[in-house]
Structure formats: C-alpha cells, structure tokens
From Swiss-Prot:
HAMAP family: Ribosomal_uL6_B. This is Large ribosomal subunit protein uL6. Keywords: Ribonucleoprotein, Ribosomal protein, RNA-binding, rRNA-binding. The keyword Ribosomal protein applies. Belongs to the universal ribosomal protein uL6 family. The keyword Transmembrane does not apply. SUPFAM superfamilies: Ribosomal protein L6. GO terms for molecular function: rRNA binding; structural constituent of ribosome. InterPro entries: Ribosomal_uL6-like (IPR000702), Ribosomal_uL6-like_a/b-dom_sf (IPR036789), Ribosomal_uL6_a/b-dom (IPR020040), Ribosomal_uL6_bac-type (IPR019906). The lineage of its organism: Bacteria, Bacillati, Actinomycetota, Actinomycetes, Mycobacteriales.
Length: 178
C-alpha cells in the first residue's frame, strides 16, 4: 500500500501557498501555479509544511490522496526549480531549429513542422539534433514532450525518430533475405 499521501510537502523559503477551499495556489521565484484538489481530500498548511488528508479509507479516496499530494509537491518544485525534459533526434536529415520562441522540425515529411511555445514553456536547441523543453508546470512540459515525440516515434528497425535523452529503444531484426 502506498503511503505517498501521508508525507507532508515542505514549503521552502520564498514560496507562498494560498489555500482557498479546494483551490491551492503556489507562488515562487519562477512563477505562479494553481490547481483544484478533488472534493473529498482536504489540504491544510501547518507552519512551513502542507498536509494533505483524506476523510476515510475508501478506495477512491486513497487514490485521490496520493494524487493530490503529488500535484501539490509538483507545484512547489515547479515554482522553485522548474522542470526540464531533454530530447534527441536520430535519423539522416532529421533536425530541429529554433524559430523565435518556437521549434521547427524537419522530419522527412514534405513540409517542416512548427511547434509553438505555450505560455510558460521555453525551448532550447543544442546543435541540430538535441533540444530541451523547460517550464514550471510538470504536466505541461511532459505533454508537450510527448506530443513532439509523437511526431516521429522511434522506428524499432532503423532506430530513426525522436526520443527522450537516455531512452533505450529495443531494436528488432528485419526479415532475412533468401
């Protein structure tokens, strides 16, 4: 049984947390995030810690308890440190470049693909094949990274495509010729 929900979230100095009913707002040096916590879960601030509690041990409340604690923790880490996802491109002729604040991909299609930077998201390009996505919202950074990866998923036969840095792709053996 997971005990993630019972661990209090420590609030570092320079971060202010405002709890208004089910709405939690976290302000820090990098920005402001807010989210709504599901109804049966209670959030309270005790000193420099945020405590998340549940009314009973029903299955749904147990799952929402851990989720709510993780959401609050992700917001605190986001406004203090931020989140970065690094990705790389493999394949002949596949490349990425920065166009203003947006990313432009050449992935073997007949047209370049432009990914616009959402509010609070920044892109950085290192060479033609490596880039990173940064922001304070962990969900938004992860979703944009997943959308970009979906533009050209890794091919298990040739190893071409977009992948997360350090991701290992299981290669397959092609058909044997006669």
């Amino acid at each position: 049984m997971s005990r993630i929900g019972f661990a209090p979230v420590s609030v570092p100095s320079g971060v202010t947390v405002t709890i208004n009913g089910q709405n939690v707002e976290v302000k820090g040096p990098k920005g402001t995030l807010n989210t709504d916590i599901p109804a049966p879960i209670a959030v309270a601030q005790e000193g420099d810690e945020i405590v998340v509690s549940r009314p009973d041990d029903h299955r749904k409340n147990r799952s929402l308890h851990g989720l709510s604690r993780s959401l609050v923790n992700n917001m605190v880490v986001g406004v203090t440190e931020g989140y970065t996802t690094k990705m790389e491109i493999f394949g002949v002729g596949y490349r990425v470049q920065l166009k203003g604040k947006d990313l432009e991909f050449s992935l073997g299609y007949s047209h370049p693909i432009l990914i616009k930077a959402d509010e609070g998201i920044t892109f950085a390009v290192d060479g033609n094949t490596k880039f990173s996505i940064s922001g304070i919202d962990k969900q938004k950074v992860g979703q944009i990274a997943a959308n970009i990866r979906g533009l050209r998923k890794d091919d298990p036969y040739k190893g071409k495509g977009i992948r997360y840095e350090g991701e290992q792709v299981r290669r397959k053996v092609g058909k044997t010729g006669k």
